[in-house]
Design a protein with these regions (language model features):
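Phosphate-binding site recognition
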Residues: 1-321
Length: 322
């Protein structure tokens, strides 16, 4: 395992689940690019018996279908050594194949199964959640050496469908971890570990720009100044993060364009707007769908809701978190 900056609590929790001696179903969530996949891969690199990542819905000329996701899952099974089974036609079949694979591979040691970007796999009318429930409730929770780790950047999906699930997965999670961006001290440690020399003033400046997201910080070139790095990442021709706003929102939110409009509007006013004001400026109807978008943006750590000093609760405002 390479050096991991921070994350001491999260690593300790993961190791505690690993050594529990019982079936574990752990959900990890947090902002995209915050380092969830990196953390799991580093901690369980030598113990992972199966690893799968859902197909991204972004950067495609057509919407990713159920068939695409099932084929990708099937290929992951083959890649990890499964033989003699045809491609599944449903998630029920796919998870049954995973059961058979784990049974035939079982030597009594801990079996770590990591399914990354779980929300992407839940395409419309796919029956994915029902199949996941059947896999865990009917088989997985009886396997004392199984540790199922699921991960997702679509925080609202993770909260609604797993952590706060009111259906068949209610109370089934044995652990949950929310991964946060680096603190200012962790940012300093990160830059030092990469031999990036910056004054503390510039580290604070970088923190205000990048928000403590390690994926972005990792692009810094040690031979460039802070201003040169920011220019190269965001403003130069073919900038690595030039289209990050669009990519990020399209990969997380169902109504990406509307969510981006809300962010653009709030970016013009530090104090934010009330729900009604925001709906009017965005030219949206302040109905349940609008409320759901606001909740999704809050749960994904893009917005906060607050009451200005001296105001009543009816004057709640929404503003950008960073």
């Amino acid at each position: 395992m390479c050096e991991i900056i921070g994350r001491k609590y999260e690593i300790a929790e993961l190791k505690r689940y690993y050594n529990s001696g019982r079936a574990e179903f752990v959900a990890i969530y947090g902002r995209r690019r915050v380092g969830k996949t990196f953390l799991i891969n580093e901690v369980f690199h030598d113990d992972m018996i199966f690893h799968h990542t859902g197909l991204s819905p972004y950067d495609r000329q057509r919407r990713v279908s159920l068939k695409d996701q099932l084929q990708n899952f099937y290929f992951s099974l083959i890649r990890h050594g499964m033989e003699g089974m045809a491609q599944p036609k449903s998630w029920m079949e796919a998870f049954f194949m995973l059961e058979r694979f784990l049974e035939t591979s079982d030597n009594g040691s801990r079996q770590v199964v990591f399914i990354d970007e779980l929300p992407w796999m839940d395409t419309a009318r796919s029956g994915f959640l029902t199949a996941l429930e059947a896999f865990w409730n009917g088989w997985g929770n009886t396997r004392h050496n199984l540790m199922l780790i699921v991960c997702g950047s679509a925080t609202s999906w993770m909260l609604d469908n797993l952590i706060n699930n009111k259906g068949g997965l209610y109370g089934r999670l044995t652990g949950e971890i929310k991964l946060y961006p680096f603190t200012l001290k962790e940012c300093e440690d990160f830059y030092h570990s990469r031999n990036i020399q910056m004054s503390r003033y510039n580290i604070v400046q970088a923190y205000m720009i990048l928000g403590g997201i390690p994926f972005y910080m990792n692009f810094f070139n040690p031979s460039l100044s802070l201003a040169q790095n920011i220019d190269a990442l965001f403003f130069s021709r073919n900038a690595k993060l030039g289209d990050e706003f669009n990519r990020l929102f399209n990969s997380i939110f169902d109504h990406a364009e509307e969510c981006m409009d809300i962010i653009r509007i709030l970016g013009k006013r530090h104090a934010g707007y009330t729900r009604q004001e925001l709906a009017e400026k965005a030219k949206m109807i302040p109905n349940g769908g609008f409320t759901k978008m606001l909740k999704a943006l809050i749960s994904s750590d893009f917005l906060i809701k607050y009451v200005p000093f001296g105001s009543s609760n009816r004057e709640e405002r929404y503003k950008l978190k960073d």
